[in-house]
Amino acid sequence: PEGYLVDTVTHCIRTGTEQNGSYKALKIWNPVEIKEKLIRGDLKLVKAADKTLKRLADIPFRITSQATGESHVILTDKNGEASTGAYWHPHTVNTNKGETSEDGIWFGEGTPDNTRGALPYGTYLVEELSCKNNEDRMLIPAFEVEVTKEMRIIDLGTLTNDEHPVPEIGTRASDRETGTHNGKR
């Protein structure tokens, strides 16, 4: 089925034997359990200030499964980098706490597995969350990402956001008779 890895193991099941032209009743001596493995992947990103590209630390990003609504937070490290991969920070360390850049992340049921991706097959919404370290900037718009391949790391690249525009105040005088901005001499 879509979203699962193909089981390439051949499972042999003894269904009965033929004796004198007739088959004996079906008996299964050892039940066979065939487990389907859900495709899993990861994502990574770099967060930087627009114009200067200064790396931004401790910026939270919420990742939400569009299929289940399950949601967890990852934070950028001191170099502005973040990843859901166990190679970055094991899934099994402070799983889904979302309090530091070193907390692991895992979506779905079951025990976190550091040999697999954190995100099961599907579409995810990625949102930058407001915090002290990005309060002077406009948050990037939320965007979707799709996990479709086993163990693929989706590189979101460097995400930047603009500073809030600085309000400007000014005056402009117009000549009442001519309507121009030039005064009479």
Where are these regions (language model features)?
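Solvent-exposed loop/turn and edge beta-strand elements of beta-rich ligand-binding domains
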Residues: P1-R185
